[in-house]
């Protein structure tokens, strides 16, 4: 049945592979395969000159009007952008100070690429900000709206001039104000001013809100036509260009903008676009949930810590541990190579038999169970323990059944939702093949009483060694206690024997004395005859 589903998907959408999810009972984890990599290998720099013109010298002296309101907005935005630019320069000057890490992490908190990308982007922005570089870019755009300019450090950038607002102000708005003042009866002029001004105001707002570094590339920073032209100029293959053109939203999310500054009525900013240079290599995702064993009120719990995306690249395997390192579109996985960690090919052993793997599979340990749901591409893993209520359900009929304690894999073709207490998780509707690797949970090898306290990201064989050491200590303690008990028992027996011997000796003495008493002769006075002697001795 699963094979027929994959074949049907192939015929409908012509995918190069079918998504397959394998559940491993031994480790309470899933491995989902069938994805293809799209890996960022570089950055493409675009420098924009957003020209405003001499708007600061235009004034309205004939009372409130729509034109006057729009002029005030434009002037205030320009002043605000100059302030943001000055603050940005001050921050960049501190990049080499101990506060560097705080600045870079602040940029990442906004969702901007990686620390390395932000640092490199800021360094390039400092180069572009040099007076000679700004002039060179303006000269390259003197007779065209788009040109490739080479910076003094040899970096080639695509320069784009956006002069719609300047052209409108100089050729239409200024003559109209000079002729009729700001209170222009033609409402179309005010509407046109607002339309031409919208991009500038939105650019100011985005840089102001993000302290000079945007978290993505919006349509205001770079229109769709500008993005298409930039992608077509990227130094990569036609197949990769085609893939990026078909995933322009992803290119925007993975890019970012940096404010350069305001120069004589021109806002200069830089847009960094990712170049996705590696495609079609296999990728897979590992998801896990806590697995626990209970015995006599004690728990032994482990959780795989090698979760995340894995992609092969140039004969090696890159591991992307963080949730935001990769993003999925259909069966393509967009990842940033700078965020990847090269791991050994043997890491695959952890996906099949974690307890006998020679590779140091990383886990976390604990003695307190955690109930949770880990959503997978084709379903979900449920860890249900203690007094927590767990169930699966259907969007049509509600709860289907209650789940027992332990780890359970729920394929998305068996349920629509997973509920833990009052929290409901919606399963994906991605269609694919489901498999299960049978096996006894690895925690069955552990005695909860001997299980180590909470440990994070340790090799599983270290957990076994820790338990073995605990068992050895207990055995030695029992041996010592046994020897001590035997010693005490020997002493007690000796004392009892001595007491008994003492009693026997005492009884013997008493008996001897009594016998001697009975056999001793009596010494009485001699008996008299009753006669008295009358003799007289003189």
From Swiss-Prot:
Region (Fusion peptide) residue spans: 103-124, 103-127
Cytoplasmic topological segments: 511-538
Membrane side Extracellular: residue ranges: 19-489
Membrane-spanning parts: 490-510
Any one Gene Ontology BP term: fusion of virus membrane with host plasma membrane
Residues in coiled coil: 125-153, 459-484
Similarity remark: Belongs to the paramyxoviruses fusion glycoprotein family.
Domain of life: Viruses
Annotated site, Cleavage, chain positions: 102-103
Record's signal peptide: 1-18
Record-level GO cellular component terms: host cell Golgi membrane; host cell plasma membrane; membrane; viral envelope; virion membrane
Keyword set, alphabetical order: Cleavage on pair of basic residues, Coiled coil, Disulfide bond, Fusion of virus membrane with host cell membrane, Fusion of virus membrane with host membrane, Glycoprotein, Host cell membrane, Host Golgi apparatus, Host membrane, Lipoprotein, Membrane, Palmitate, Signal, Transmembrane, Transmembrane helix, Viral envelope protein, Viral penetration into host cytoplasm, Virion, Virus entry into host cell
The name this protein goes by in its record: Fusion glycoprotein F0
Disulfide-bond pairs as recorded: 28-407, 60-182, 283-311, 292-301, 326-335, 350-361, 384-390
InterPro entries referenced in this protein's UniProt entry, alphabetically: Fusion_F0_Paramyxovir
Positions where lipid (S-palmitoyl cysteine) attaches: 513
Gene3D superfamilies: 1.10.287.2480
Encoding gene (name): F
Glycosylated position list: 57, 353
């Amino acid at each position: 049945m699963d094979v027929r589903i994959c074949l049907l998907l192939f015929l409908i959408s012509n995918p190069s592979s079918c998504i397959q999810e394998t559940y491993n009972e031994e480790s309470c984890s899933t491995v989902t395969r069938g994805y293809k990599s799209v890996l960022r290998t570089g950055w493409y720099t675009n420098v924009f000159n957003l020209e405003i013109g001499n708007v600061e010298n235009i004034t309205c002296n004939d009372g409130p009007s729509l034109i006057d309101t729009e002029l005030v907005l434009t002037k205030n935005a320009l002043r605000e952008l100059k302030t943001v630019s000055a603050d940005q320069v001050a921050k960049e000057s501190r990049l080499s100070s101990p506060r560097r890490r705080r600045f870079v992490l602040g940029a990442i908190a906004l969702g901007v690429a990686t620390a390395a990308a932000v640092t490199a982007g800021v360094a390039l922005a400092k180069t572009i900000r040099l007076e000679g570089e700004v002039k060179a870019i303006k000269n390259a755009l003197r007779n065209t709206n788009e040109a490739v300019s080479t910076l003094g450090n040899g970096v080639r950038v695509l320069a784009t001039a956006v002069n719609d607002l300047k052209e409108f102000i100089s050729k239409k708005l200024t003559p109209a104000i000079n002729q009729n003042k700001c209170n222009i009866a033609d409402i179309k002029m005010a509407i046109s001013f607002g339309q031409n001004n919208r991009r500038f105001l939105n650019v100011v707002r985005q840089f102001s809100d993000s302290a000079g570094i945007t978290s993505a590339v919006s349509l205001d920073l770079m229109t769709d036509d500008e993005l298409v032209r930039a992608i077509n100029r990227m130094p990569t293959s036609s197949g990769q260009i085609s893939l990026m053109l078909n995933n322009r939203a992803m290119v925007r999310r993975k890019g970012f903008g940096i404010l350069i500054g305001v120069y004589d009525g021109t806002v200069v900013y830089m847009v960094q676009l990712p170049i996705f240079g590696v495609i079609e290599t296999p990728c897979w995702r590992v998801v896990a949930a806590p697995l626990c064993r209970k015995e006599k009120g004690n728990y032994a719990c482990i959780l795989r810590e090698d979760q995340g995306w894995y992609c092969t690249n140039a004969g090696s395997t890159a591991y992307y541990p963080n949730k935001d390192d990769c993003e999925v579109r259909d069966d393509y996985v967009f990842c940033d190579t700078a965020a990847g960690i090269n791991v050994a090919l043997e890491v695959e052993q952890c996906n099949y038999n974690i307890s006998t793997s020679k590779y140091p599979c990383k886990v976390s340990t604990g003695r307190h169970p955690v109930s949770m749901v880990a959503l997978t591409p084709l379903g979900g893993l449920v860890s249900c323990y203690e007094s927590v209520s767990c169930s699966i359900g259907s969007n049509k009929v509600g709860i289907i059944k209650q789940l027992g304690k332990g780890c359970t894999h729920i394929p998305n073709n068996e349920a629509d939702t997973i509920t833990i207490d009052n929290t409901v998780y919606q399963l994906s509707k991605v269609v694919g093949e489901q498999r299960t690797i049978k096996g006894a949970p690895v925690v069955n090898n552990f005695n909860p009483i001997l299980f180590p306290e909470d440990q994070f990201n340790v090799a599983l064989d270290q957990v076994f060694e820790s338990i073995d050491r605990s068992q050895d200590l207990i055995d030695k303690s029992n041996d010592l206690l046994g020897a001590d008990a035997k010693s005490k028992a020997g002493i007690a027996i000796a004392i009892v024997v001595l007491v008994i011997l003492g009693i026997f000796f005492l009884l013997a003495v008493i008996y001897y004395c009594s016998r001697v008493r009975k056999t001793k002769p009596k010494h009485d006075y001699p008996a008299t005859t009753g006669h008295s002697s009358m003799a007289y001795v003189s």
